[in-house]
Amino acid sequence: MNIHEYQAKALLREFGVPVSRGVPVLQASEAEAAAETLGGPVWVVKSQIHAGGRGKGKFKEASAGEKGGVRLARSIDEVKTFAGQMLGATLVTAQTGPAGKQVNRLYIEEGSDIDKEFYFSALVDRETSRISFVVSTEGGMNIEEVAHKTPEKIVTFSVDPATGVMSHHGRTVARALRLRGDLGKQAEKLVTQLYDAFIARDMAMLEINPLVVTKQGELRVLDAKISFDSNALYRHSDVVALRDESEEDAKEIEASRFDLSYVALDGQIGCMVNGAGLAMATMDIIKLYGMAPANFLDVGGGATKDKVAAAFKIITADPNVKGILINIFGGIMKCDVIADGVVAAVKQVGLNVPLVVRLEGTNVDAGKKIIRESGLNVLPADDLDDAAQKIVKAVKEVA
């Protein structure tokens, strides 16, 4: 689960992390009061969407002006003008895709006199089962680009969960960022604060880009992005309360209600599979034969008829889907349950695109019989390769 920048900063502030003062704004009429509260003389007006690259992004609407999603204002009138332009407009960034995202919230923040910019992040390293830190002197930039062009400028290290953060971790960060004296001590303290926040709130990723040194000689978090471990949300009602469903794909929200693992993608072939590994293999082979998957969807091993029907409805609700591939290898999941769910869903919502079904495993004969006797226009497949070729061919023929 992701949250907005202003929410992330409020959370970090609880752990003593140095963040700039700011005020969230939902309506343009609130901008003037927010700016007056902060005092100026410089303000930063920030679009709040769940995507990076806001500063370099562009709004679709001409009325929003030519500037990006993060704007520097030198007067209260400018703050008001920017708020009026940006709220309700659609911001397109490198991470939103061409559709962009509507800006429904702003964060008006006090300006900072910046001397240096750094990159700092913490994330769960699944290979080591530890929290890893990534730091770089190249702040304010795309860290993937830095890793590609100048990997020597990135320093990483992990923390043993048995000991937690120790003083040498802080010194490692200070040394990597070339911070000495009081700034080095601030860096050591910051590492402990961020680690404590990460653990206490069950975060999956914490990214600060940039972490800055002000001209007053202070470390300050200028931008913060936090993702939480969804499996741990039951322990954090306060974090769940921060969820902004308007920033999430409606199909993904619906899928979560049925405990389905669903991720919307940009392709044209909808997929329903049991097992994450098989789902990824299915997506790969669709790409191999020249088309792209419209989603990742794992119905899991214990799916019921209703759950399968819900999954099918979610796939067909995507207007980009031009064909559907169902690939089931029944172990715990029974093929006849899948078949019952698909038939029930098709009878409710109809079927206007080609459908290929590949069933193998537990109760496979019963499953094939249910589909065969349903009267549905379904293309059966013998194996995954056959299924992928058939759905790609069927979609291309319809197009």
Curated annotation (Swiss-Prot):
Q: Which GO terms describe its molecular function?
A: ATP binding; magnesium ion binding; succinate-CoA ligase (ADP-forming) activity; succinate-CoA ligase (GDP-forming) activity
Q: Which EC class does it fall in?
A: ligase
Binding residue positions for Mg(2+): N209, D223
**Which residues are ATP-binding?**
K46, G53, R54, G55, E109, S112, E117
Cofactor comment in the record?
Binds 1 Mg(2+) ion per subunit.
Q: Which pathway is recorded for this entry?
A: Carbohydrate metabolism; tricarboxylic acid cycle; succinate from succinyl-CoA (ligase route): step 1/1
Give the SUPFAM superfamilies listed for this entry.
Answer: Glutathione synthetase ATP-binding domain-like (SSF56059), Succinyl-CoA synthetase domains (SSF52210)
Q: Which GO terms describe its cellular component?
A: cytosol; succinate-CoA ligase complex
Checking InterPro entries in the record gives: ATP-grasp (IPR011761), ATP-grasp_succ-CoA_synth-type (IPR013650), ATP_grasp_subdomain_1 (IPR013815), SUCC_ACL_C (IPR005811), Succ_CoA_ligase-like_bsu (IPR005809), Succinyl-CoA_synth-like (IPR016102)
Names of the cofactor(s): Mg(2+)
Keywords noted in UniProt: ATP-binding, Ligase, Magnesium, Metal-binding, Nucleotide-binding, Tricarboxylic acid cycle
**Keyword Transmembrane applies:** no
What Enzyme Commission number does this protein have?
6.2.1.5
What sequence ranges are listed for the domain ATP-grasp?
9-254
**List of residues binding substrate:** N274, G331, I332, M333
Gene Ontology biological-process annotations:
succinyl-CoA metabolic process; tricarboxylic acid cycle
Q: Which Pfam families match?
A: ATP-grasp_2, Ligase_CoA
Spell out the reaction equation it catalyses.
succinate + ATP + CoA = succinyl-CoA + ADP + phosphate; GTP + succinate + CoA = succinyl-CoA + GDP + phosphate
Which HAMAP family does the UniProt entry name for this protein? Answer: Succ_CoA_beta
Q: Which family does it belong to?
A: Belongs to the succinate/malate CoA ligase beta subunit family.
- Please give the subunit comment from the record: Heterotetramer of two alpha and two beta subunits.
Q: What function does this protein fulfil?
A: Succinyl-CoA synthetase functions in the citric acid cycle (TCA), coupling the hydrolysis of succinyl-CoA to the synthesis of either ATP or GTP and thus represents the only step of substrate-level phosphorylation in the TCA. The beta subunit provides nucleotide specificity of the enzyme and binds the substrate succinate, while the binding sites for coenzyme A and phosphate are found in the alpha subunit.
User: What is the name attached to this protein's record?
Assistant: Succinate--CoA ligase [ADP-forming] subunit beta
The beginning of the lineage is: Bacteria, Pseudomonadati, Pseudomonadota, Alphaproteobacteria, Hyphomicrobiales
